[in-house]
Amino acid sequence: MALAAARRVLLQAGSRLGRRGAVDGARRFSNKRVLVEKEGEAGIAVMKFKNPPVNSLSLEFLTEFVISLEKLENDKSIRGVILTSERPGIFSAGLDLMEMYGRNPAHYAEYWKAVQELWLRLYLSNLTLISAINGASPAGGCLMALTCDYRIMADNSKYTIGLNESLLGIVAPFWLKDNYVNTIGHRAAERALQLGTLFPPAEALKVGLVDEVVPEDQVHSKARSVMAKWFTIPDHSRQLTKSMMRKATADNLIKQREADIQNFTSFISRDSIQKSLHVYLEKLKQKKG
């Protein structure tokens, strides 16, 4: 109920913002946590994450992101979207641990449903999606990148990408595991998931987690040039092929959404898991201090 109400309010606000005039040849609409720059003549929109300090996937961010994506999917002038961070250095730190710690089961269920929705909307989108990974991308940040049709990462050894949930004492959901296996292969995914491996750019390229590694100042220009190449393919044939390749993986979640929510809620509510999250959060506080 709360998520649906938030979606209605944000859609109304987004509609008002979407009617503003063009700015420097690009139309923008924005909410607190996502900035969208539309380049209608090129058929491209750029979605920039702006949820400081680390672009964590809070419930509010997830809601605003899905609404922004929905607006773009309904815009006939847009054929592709580039996902990136407004703040270089951090693509997204992933799921917001504060949404999973010290809350009640109803909140955990609402949050996990929003996480599922993010993945499904991105994974099944008819738009061409390219991630311009201009910073660290662990866990949920990697989730968003994995849904894209093409991934470009900045060549900076300080940046890493991967699903490191096991290091936090939690487990990646089966549908994200499937996405990972489809991307880097079963054995590489099995090893990386158990160890919580975070890959620097060169290693991410080697295992197939990203498609290109480029100098940091060329990430966005490369994303645009790659998008232009994808635009040479007729939309209908590309979309049908994408659906054919991804439908079985997505259906695996769609058929089990409620069970997955219940499993997550039960798992995250365990005392042992809450204690693990508490320890991890305390370590983060000490690092900041």
Swiss-Prot record:
Define the transit peptide region by residue numbers. Answer: 1-28
One Pfam match, by short name? ECH_1
Q: Mark the residues carrying the PTM N6-acetyllysine.
A: 48, 76, 222, 229, 255, 283
Pathway(s) annotated for this protein in UniProt: Lipid metabolism; fatty acid beta-oxidation
Annotated GO CC locations: mitochondrial matrix; mitochondrion
Q: Which SUPFAM superfamilies match?
A: ClpP/crotonase (SSF52096)
**Which compartment or compartments is the protein found in?**
Mitochondrion matrix
What is the reaction catalyzed?
a (3Z)-enoyl-CoA = a 4-saturated (2E)-enoyl-CoA; a (3E)-enoyl-CoA = a 4-saturated (2E)-enoyl-CoA; (3Z)-octenoyl-CoA = (2E)-octenoyl-CoA; (2E)-tetradecenoyl-CoA = (3Z)-tetradecenoyl-CoA
Q: Which residues carry this modification: N6-succinyllysine?
A: 48, 71, 222, 229, 255, 275, 283
Ligase as a keyword of this entry, yes or no, is no
Locate the residues binding substrate. 93-97, 140, 164
Q: Does the keyword Mitochondrion apply?
A: yes
What broad class of enzyme is this?
A: isomerase
Signal sequence annotation: none
CDD domains linked? crotonase-like
Q: Where is this site: Important for catalytic activity?
A: 165
User: One MF term from GO for this chain?
Assistant: identical protein binding
List its EC numbers. Answer: 5.3.3.8
| Oligomer and partners | Homotrimer.
Function (record text): Key enzyme of fatty acid beta-oxidation. Able to isomerize both 3-cis (3Z) and 3-trans (3E) double bonds into the 2-trans (2E) form in a range of enoyl-CoA species, with a preference for (3Z)-enoyl-CoAs over (3E)-enoyl-CoAs. The catalytic efficiency of this enzyme is not affected by the fatty acyl chain length.
Protein name, per record: Enoyl-CoA delta isomerase 1, mitochondrial
Q: Which organism is it from?
A: Rattus norvegicus (Rat)
